[in-house]
């Protein structure tokens, strides 16, 4: 773990007995929401349909080796979200998200290298990210919160037009205000919301394309190019609001 004096430390106090808030999803949105709730003196109860980040890795291997997919534990669902087993790059192309220093410092507090605080293109790394995610979960639990795996939200509890909690596939209900951090693959959640007249709003999407090249060609471009090394990320503006990114 990095030393405390190498990053800005956030204090997470014990929130046992405090009002609870239900967080649906243990991806980056859900984990950071839970940590922020603790900062505000509220008790997070995180409900995740998939498995913890270590157990989930076995299900990902099963996809590659046996071509069998667990619908609740895969690349989309499980602790850490869809990016848990990507290469751990941290960046945003949005100009509207404000300062991200707090986010980077929280990552460092939970085991990420402090190099991400100064690197132009911060990168945690696939090998280190699961441990960072586990440490975030441990912070939530040690502060009095809860994390429930293999627990899928099946419905909101709505009384007189107000959300009072959630029902789950285990038969257990959780009461309190609800934060939905389900990710874009939880189509069953969005179908339920639409069918039950809960206001939802569509947002723009990003479609990525990965091109594979011979290693020799990439070496030539990156290390033997008289014009210098290619940029890590470049943007080509074709027409607004469309934006094309080349990585």
PLM feature spans:
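Conserved N-terminal/central alpha/beta ligand/cofactor-binding core
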Residues: 55, 61-146, 151-152, 203-210
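N-terminal Rossmann-fold NAD(P) dinucleotide-binding loop
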Residues: 30
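A conserved short coil-to-beta-strand element within the FAD-binding core of flavoproteins
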Residues: 149-162
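Short hydrophobic core segments
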Residues: 22-24, 153, 173-183
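Single conserved hydrophobic/aromatic residue that forms the stacking wall/gate
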Residues: 236-247
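Extreme N-terminal leader/targeting segments of oxidoreductases
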Residues: 1-19
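Glycine-rich loop(s) and the adjacent beta-strand/alpha-helix scaffold that form part
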Residues: 180-229
């Amino acid at each position: 773990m990095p030393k405390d004096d190498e990053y800005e430390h956030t204090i997470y106090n014990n929130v046992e007995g405090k009002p609870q808030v239900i967080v649906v999803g243990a991806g980056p949105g859900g984990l950071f929401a839970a940590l922020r709730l603790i900062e505000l003196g509220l008790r997070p109860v995180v409900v995740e349909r998939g498995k913890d980040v270590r157990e989930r890795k076995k299900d990902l291997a099963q996809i590659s080796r046996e071509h069998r997919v667990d619908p609740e534990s895969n690349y989309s669902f499980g602790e850490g979200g869809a990016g848990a087993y990507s290469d751990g790059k941290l960046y945003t192309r949005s100009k509207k998200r404000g300062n991200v220093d707090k986010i980077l410092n929280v990552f460092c507090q939970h085991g990420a290298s402090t190099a991400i605080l100064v690197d132009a293109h911060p990168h945690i790394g696939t090998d280190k990210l699961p441990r960072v995610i586990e440490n975030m979960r441990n912070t939530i639990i040690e502060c009095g919160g809860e994390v429930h795996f293999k627990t899928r939200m099946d419905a909101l509890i709505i009384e007189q037009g107000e959300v009072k909690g959630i029902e789950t596939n285990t038969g257990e209900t959780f009461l309190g205000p609800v934060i939905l951090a389900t990710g874009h693959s939880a189509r069953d959640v969005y179908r339920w919301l639409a069918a039950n007249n809960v206001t939802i709003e569509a947002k723009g999407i990003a479609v990525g394309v990965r091109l594979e090249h011979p290693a020799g060609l990439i070496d030539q471009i990156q290390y033997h190019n008289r014009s210098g090394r290619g940029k890590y990320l470049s943007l080509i503006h074709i027409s607004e609001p469309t934006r094309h990114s080349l990585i």
